[in-house]
Amino acid sequence: MNRQKKLVILVLRYVSIFLNLFKDSGYHKILSPFDGNIVPSDMIAESNISRDVFGNSLGIQPVENKVLSPCACIVERISPVGNAMLLKVGNAHLIINIGLEFEKYKKEFFKLNVVEGQRLSKGQKLMSFDIEKIYKVDTNFVCTITVKQNRTSRHVSFINAKHVSFDTILCTLNVL
């Protein structure tokens, strides 16, 4: 009996080690969903973004009219107009806004490629938008990404750069 217990314990240890090799570390690299020029959050006219009310934010003036998934995540919510999305990553949320003057936008400005509840992979196309039509109604057009974490999570530090492309790592999140 003693020998069987030792064998069971040994097998359980090896199984545990094996499973830990594939365990999610909890750290997710968040890539830029946009290709464009960085606008620090304190320079954005929208006061909730500039004061980081919803979480740590970063503005980007896009040079391309498409938005890609910044990481593996789930689409939790899409705004009625289609200019904003709430993405779930572990216990954190990413809020992506294509412009902040949503009351001026029309649904036809945005072409969605995803639906609520959909699981996304990193780099998957979320949407495209008509940048010319948006600039006509919103001269201060800027896109934002906001990281909203639970109370126990730490402050998010974004990359210090002037320009980002779709493969630029904006920040790393611990989402466990």
Can you say where each PLM-predicted feature lies in the sequence?
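Contiguous, well-folded functional domains in the mature portion of proteins
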Residues: 1-176
